Amino acid sequence: MKHLHRFFSSDASGGIILIIAAILAMIMANSGATSGWYHDFLETPVQLRVGSLEINKNMLLWINDALMAVFFLLVGLEVKRELMQGSLASLRQAAFPVIAAIGGMIVPALLYLAFNYADPITREGWAIPAATDIAFALGVLALLGSRVPLVLKIFLMALAIIDDLGAIIIIALFYTNDLSMASLGVAAVAIAVLAVLNLCGVRRTGVYILVGVVLWTAVLKSGVHATLAGVIVGFFIPLKEKHGRSPAKRLEHVLHPWVAYLILPLFAFANAGVSLQGVTLDGLTSILPLGIIAGLLIGKPLGISLFCWLALRLKLAHLPEGTTYQQIMVVGILCGIGFTMSIFIASLAFGSVDPELINWAKLGILVGSISSAVIGYSWLRVRLRPSV
């Protein structure tokens, strides 16, 4: 029990559990003895009905759309705290992750197109390396425990949120044909209600969560990635203390263990089980995986580093206090972990064209993401001193 308590008290414990869950999923998805059970579990239908409203999704989508909205709620709370009171409190500091995210989307896409522009079919996958899997990127960072300055974690969160918002916009504009404007209208009303609650000084967290559920349902029905609702709710929950209590900080404290030890490991288990059937190393010589690997492994850190350097030179932004430019470069490498978000975009780009293209894309995403994780983790482990 003493060793167990020590493990869960460690800052790295959440990241370790997430990686174990991901490895277990890969083994089960590619083992003849367990692959059937694994996929049956993910395809288990779960239905929720309230009056005439019905949400009928399989287990995988409930994990990705519902549980991960809670993760994004926590991320929204943490980023808001830093924007209001912490390392991103000034306009130029807050602009830094925005500029970094823009570079981290543009350069990987251009690098991918450098390989695939001549092929009108594979060209459609240009957005694949522009995505970052925030959960796995933070999971790798968590493996370093207390070595990692909080400000660096917040910078990665802020950058990845903007990256995810960019990916959601890209999906909506280029890969979605059936957006529901009525549902988007309901979502807009829910956001307006959240704003009014905040302006009126309402401090009951439950009220925000209730409106957040309406917002999540509307965003889900609209065809846009539903996890976006979590970030929005997090930004509206009051942060200021009154009588020594802050609703945002209190909720952040409550959510953290649930996210670290249940939601993120479940997400990893549900999404890391990529079947390697039909995937061969010979495919690495094709322009599709080469473009993805180049975009994730080279384009991400290059784009983030270049745009950050330009922002500093032109005095458009400031480095977050307590960080170095070299640390920002390594965060750029970790942002090359595209994984589930990249696989999702690949399925949208090639799902109706050729299943073999999806296999090649998966190969490129796995190689690029794993390489980014290993290099980023190793570099930070060498450069960051353990806290005493």
UniProtKB/Swiss-Prot annotation:
<keyword id="KW-0406">Ion transport</keyword>
<feature type="topological domain" description="Periplasmic">
    <location>
        <begin position="32"/>
        <end position="58"/>
    </location>
</feature>
<keyword id="KW-0915">Sodium</keyword>
<dbReference type="Pfam" id="PF06965">
    <property type="entry name" value="Na_H_antiport_1"/>
</dbReference>
<feature type="topological domain" description="Periplasmic">
    <location>
        <position position="223"/>
    </location>
</feature>
<feature type="transmembrane region" description="Helical; Name=11">
    <location>
        <begin position="340"/>
        <end position="350"/>
    </location>
</feature>
<comment type="function">
    <text>Na(+)/H(+) antiporter that extrudes sodium in exchange for external protons.</text>
</comment>
<feature type="transmembrane region" description="Helical; Name=9">
    <location>
        <begin position="254"/>
        <end position="272"/>
    </location>
</feature>
<feature type="topological domain" description="Cytoplasmic">
    <location>
        <begin position="237"/>
        <end position="253"/>
    </location>
</feature>
<feature type="topological domain" description="Cytoplasmic">
    <location>
        <begin position="381"/>
        <end position="388"/>
    </location>
</feature>
<feature type="transmembrane region" description="Helical; Name=5">
    <location>
        <begin position="155"/>
        <end position="176"/>
    </location>
</feature>
<dbReference type="InterPro" id="IPR023171">
    <property type="entry name" value="Na/H_antiporter_dom_sf"/>
</dbReference>
<comment type="similarity">
    <text>Belongs to the NhaA Na(+)/H(+) (TC 2.A.33) antiporter family.</text>
</comment>
<feature type="topological domain" description="Cytoplasmic">
    <location>
        <begin position="131"/>
        <end position="154"/>
    </location>
</feature>
<dbReference type="GO" id="GO:0015385">
    <property type="term" value="F:sodium:proton antiporter activity"/>
</dbReference>
<feature type="transmembrane region" description="Helical; Name=7">
    <location>
        <begin position="205"/>
        <end position="222"/>
    </location>
</feature>
<keyword id="KW-1003">Cell membrane</keyword>
<keyword id="KW-1133">Transmembrane helix</keyword>
<keyword id="KW-0813">Transport</keyword>
<dbReference type="GO" id="GO:0005886">
    <property type="term" value="C:plasma membrane"/>
</dbReference>
<feature type="topological domain" description="Periplasmic">
    <location>
        <begin position="117"/>
        <end position="122"/>
    </location>
</feature>
<keyword id="KW-0812">Transmembrane</keyword>
<feature type="transmembrane region" description="Helical; Name=2">
    <location>
        <begin position="59"/>
        <end position="80"/>
    </location>
</feature>
<feature type="topological domain" description="Cytoplasmic">
    <location>
        <begin position="81"/>
        <end position="96"/>
    </location>
</feature>
<keyword id="KW-0050">Antiport</keyword>
<feature type="topological domain" description="Cytoplasmic">
    <location>
        <begin position="1"/>
        <end position="11"/>
    </location>
</feature>
<dbReference type="InterPro" id="IPR004670">
    <property type="entry name" value="NhaA"/>
</dbReference>
<protein>
    <recommendedName>
        <fullName>Na(+)/H(+) antiporter NhaA</fullName>
    </recommendedName>
</protein>
<keyword id="KW-0997">Cell inner membrane</keyword>
<feature type="transmembrane region" description="Helical; Name=3">
    <location>
        <begin position="97"/>
        <end position="116"/>
    </location>
</feature>
<feature type="transmembrane region" description="Helical; Name=10">
    <location>
        <begin position="287"/>
        <end position="310"/>
    </location>
</feature>
<feature type="transmembrane region" description="Helical; Name=1">
    <location>
        <begin position="12"/>
        <end position="31"/>
    </location>
</feature>
<feature type="topological domain" description="Cytoplasmic">
    <location>
        <begin position="201"/>
        <end position="204"/>
    </location>
</feature>
<keyword id="KW-0472">Membrane</keyword>
<feature type="transmembrane region" description="Helical; Name=6">
    <location>
        <begin position="181"/>
        <end position="200"/>
    </location>
</feature>
<dbReference type="GO" id="GO:0006885">
    <property type="term" value="P:regulation of pH"/>
</dbReference>
<feature type="transmembrane region" description="Helical; Name=4">
    <location>
        <begin position="123"/>
        <end position="130"/>
    </location>
</feature>
<keyword id="KW-0739">Sodium transport</keyword>
<feature type="topological domain" description="Periplasmic">
    <location>
        <begin position="273"/>
        <end position="286"/>
    </location>
</feature>
<feature type="transmembrane region" description="Helical; Name=8">
    <location>
        <begin position="224"/>
        <end position="236"/>
    </location>
</feature>
<feature type="topological domain" description="Periplasmic">
    <location>
        <begin position="177"/>
        <end position="180"/>
    </location>
</feature>
<feature type="topological domain" description="Cytoplasmic">
    <location>
        <begin position="311"/>
        <end position="339"/>
    </location>
</feature>
